Amino acid sequence: MSHMLRVICVFPIRVYQRCISPVLPPACRYYPTCSAYAAEAVMTHGVLRGGWLALKRLARCHPWGGSGYDPVPPSRRRRDVPPLSQE
């Protein structure tokens, strides 16, 4: 269910990337582009956290903002966290 929701939420981003973005001049100051970042963030972190990361990225992407390499942060799932003690 969760994966399907992520795919559904990423679909409009993919439509933008394939249909709208090619006819517009390049404008994103970051790599990966904001749309690629948003799609990866939603697929990696889920709809809520990934959407929040995408919104924060879009807010930073303006002429007076930063630029350069800005990857999606790694997932913070509990299974990625090592145990506190080695029993």
UniProtKB/Swiss-Prot annotation:
Pfam families in the cross-refs: YidD
Bilayer topology annotation: Peripheral membrane protein
Region (Disordered): 64-87
UniProt keyword list: Cell inner membrane, Cell membrane, Membrane
Domain of life: Bacteria
Gene Ontology cellular-component annotations: plasma membrane
Subcellular location: Cell inner membrane
Function: Could be involved in insertion of integral membrane proteins into the membrane.
Family: Belongs to the UPF0161 family.
Protein name as it appears in the record: Putative membrane protein insertion efficiency factor
Organism annotation: Desulfovibrio desulfuricans (strain ATCC 27774 / DSM 6949 / MB)
Organism ancestry: Bacteria, Pseudomonadati, Thermodesulfobacteriota, Desulfovibrionia, Desulfovibrionales
